Structure formats: C-alpha cells, structure tokens
Amino acid sequence: MNLYLFSWEGKMNRRQFLKSTATTATALFAGCAVNNNSTTNRIGKKLAGSRANIVFILSDDMGWAEPGFNGGNPELTPNIDRLASDGLRLTQFYTHSVCSPTRAAFLTGRYAFRNWMDWRSEDFGKPSYLEKLGLTLAHNDEGVPTRRIHALDTNERTIAEALKEAGYFTAIIGKWHAGEWLKEHLPMQRGFMHQYGHYAWGVDYYDKTIPHNAPARFVVYDWHRNEQPIREEGYTTDLIAAETERVIARQNKEKPFFLYIPFNAVHGPVVRVPRYTDKYTPREAALKCFDDALGRIAAALEKHGFADNTLLIFTNDNGGLTEEINKPYRGTKNTTFEGGVRAPCIIRWPGHTQPGTVNDGMMFIADFFTTFISIAGGRHEQELPVDSLDMTGMLCRGESSPRDEIVFEVSGSVRIPTIRKGDYKLMGKLLYNIKTDPYETTDIAARHPDIVKRLRARLMEVDAERPPLGDKPLLMEPPLPYVYGIEENENPPEWLKEAVDRIRATQPKEWAPGETPWPQAPKAPVGSL
C-alpha cells in the first residue's frame, strides 16, 4: 500500500513492459509539464535552471540491515539516516544480485542478461564460476595468464548519453565496472563529460591497485581522471567525496547536472581505514567513512544553493556478503533470495517527496533510466527496447507502482533463474509468496504447481529474449598491463610502474586451486528452468 500523497499537476505516461516508449512523454518538474519533442538546443535554452539536478549515490555491498533506519547502529550512519528522515524511503526496491549487472541495468534501463553483462561480469577468474560457464582461466597464445575483455556493448544507450543529449552536464565519480580496457568502453565514450575513479570491479582503498583472480602476479593500477592515470594520496572514499565537492562547486544554475557517484565502499578488502577503528571494527569504520562522504556531498549541494532543486538518491548495488547484515532477509550478495536483491533506497526531492515517508511499491534499479529521462524532459525513443518503467507517479504523486514483475536472472549465468511476478517469486524450483513470507522461510512450490507452471513459462519466454553471445570475448593485450585503459597503458608514468612492480613482488606466483585473492559470497542452491 502506498502511504503518501503529493500534489504534482498533470498526468504521466506509463511505460509498457519490454516496449519502447511512444514518441512523446510528459515530463514533470517544478510543477510544470514539458514537451519532450523539443530539440536539445531548445530544451537547453528554455529550461536551463528549471529542471532538477540529479545526484545518484551508490554504495557497494552494503547490507540491508546496516543503515540505522533499517535496524543498524545509528552511530555509523547519521547522514544516511538524516537523508531518510528528509526524504522518501522505498521498502521494495530491487537490484540484480552482483555489481556489474546492477550497474548495467541502471545505465541502460535494461536487464543485464540482454547484453550478457550477467555473464561477462563472471568470466574473468573465479574458478567455480568458470567451470559452470564452460571456460578456463584466460591465457594468451603463449600461455601467459590474462583477462578477457568484458564490457557494456557500445550499441547500448546509457542514461548519461540520454541526459547529455537533454542538455545536462554529466559526470561519473567512483566505480565504473562496465568496461575497463578498450577506449570505446570507458565512461567518457558512454556519455559522461567528466570521469574520476576506477574502471574495474574493485580497488585497494589506498594503493589504487587491484589484484585479479588469475594464476599470476596480476596487479593493475586503476585510478583515473578523464581517462588519464592520476597519482593521489588518500582513502578512496574520501577522495570520491572531495572530487564530488569540486564538481558541484563548478556547476551553475543555468545548466542542470547529473552526477553518478558509485562508491567502492564498503566492498572488500576492508583492511586499512583512516579513522574510527579505535571504536569500531574495520567494516564498521569503513561504513562510517562512507556516511561521512554522503554527508559531505549533501552539504556541498546545500552550500552552493542546489539542494532545493536536486533529486538526491541513495541506494546500494546488491545485498551484503553475509546474512547477518541483510537481516531479516534470507540470502546474500550473489543469490536471488531477498537478502541478495532487496536494497535500501532513499529519494529526496524537495517539493516533490515528503520528508519521512515510506513507499512499499515495487521498483527495480533499471526504472531510474526512464524516470530520469522524464524528469529531464529528455528523449525516450531509442532503438533498443527498455525494461525500465516511469516511476514518477509512484514516487511523486502516491500512485501505485506500475511494476509487477522483475526478472532477476535467466539461464546462462552462474546464478539461479529467478522471476518475481506480483506476490510470488520463482527461484529455480523454489516458490515463495513474498507478501506473506518476505523472509522466504517456506517453499510453497508443491502446494501451487499452477503458479510454478505459469511463472516458469513466463521466465522461459523472457529467457528466449537473451541475444546470441556471439564471438568469444577478446583477451587483453598485453596480458599483464600496468594500468587499465589500453591507451593509458601504452606509456604509463614511471611512478605508476614502480608502484605496481612493488606490489606484484609481494603477490604469489599462482593461486591454489579454487582460491582467489578476494572474498566470495556463499554459493546459492542450484536451480534451473
């Protein structure tokens, strides 16, 4: 049940599931309706200063139960909790169950399986995953271990491209994880006008390097500004906050901006943390540092006069690594139990969301794609159909959610094919009623074979929409680069090579069978279509 009501004027179009939008859509902001057929130049001239800025903050591997408003220690998340009290909190907000698929869905408004990002994110070195995918650890023709190139397809339209076309300044500050090697896969080729942070799936918070799951001393530097490696001292969580402050300070009220701020916090390895460890565990201290960063960003928006006209969103990319931090939900990251895919989400938009309200309508992270375009007065038409639905009615006028289905996984990945339709979720051979049993304690498949049959048929229908994989992914060349970004690696600075060589000298020459240098989530039960 939706528990709040807003007074926005006008009527919003609703997106048809798996269909592209009609040629026009009504975008609402500041109480006004805008014609989306306006050209980019006309939009920029007519609407500059009136359209909402959009700031999207994404944490990494935070558990459902870690924010204070969800039962966590309020000492660790005062700024997140303050944002929750100032904004709208969603209780049925969903993501994919791991990093890269979630980011791909957010960027494109499409399920990750549609561009194989659910598979590509797993093809680079986790031995148990590779076995399921019929792959081996990547080696070049000379037998030197390397990585397969995996990235978001270049024919995908990103939210950054859509908002840039609509006249927004666009920036990514933090973790990209949608392609780290070929130039055409990097953020500034995908619609972002400013880039800062790291390209790949994780980074040491101080060294800015990442060891990969390969049987070699494979350590790569991964810290960049506008596609150039940069040398910076400090803790990445703090650095991302500082860069965001600088970017906000450079904005003006004549041009709206979209800031995508995907932190690597609180993803492992969490070993060294700059403060709070005298009182808290390293993980808790890292969470509190992230909360500090979110507070700095909110304060910067206020300081520079943007807060009242900014749609500020906080959420997380997937469930936490342990069930303890996902309570009361079952499951973890890398599973499609609720604990792996239900994420905390807060939305604050002064004048459009009411402080301290809660909405239990179903929403998927891909829905931000269409929602943002509507708010921006952008163009919905595109070649590839989207799965994203326009949520402005639910978020800003108290309407029921237009979403009643989420496809979390189809066949072909290492996780269990899973679909939620209405109250029911089919997860392989398991069936749960999420409305009456949100903690997934009781499998009711045997009692409801008709529902199982119907959901399996729907899942198979969607599964058939996965495109052919195509050619086997290319390998990185050279096999052991110093820095991500093929052009950045052509002539890396000496300080960078020395730093990488120093760390490589401490790495084992090979990993023991089945082992990897990064912690992995527990395995999910096996299921199939």
Residue spans of the language-model regions?
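Formylglycine-dependent
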Residues: 122-169, 177-257, 263-272
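N-terminal export signals
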Residues: 2-5, 16-36
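Histidine-centered active-site microenvironments of extracellular/periplasmic hydrolases
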Residues: 75, 182-191, 269-274, 279, ...
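A short beta-strand-to-alpha-helix junction
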Residues: 49-50, 72-77, 94-98, 146-157, ...
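Short, structured active-site-proximal loop/turn typified by the sulfatase FGly-forming signature C/S-X-P-X-R
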Residues: 73-104, 109-113, 169-171, 193-199
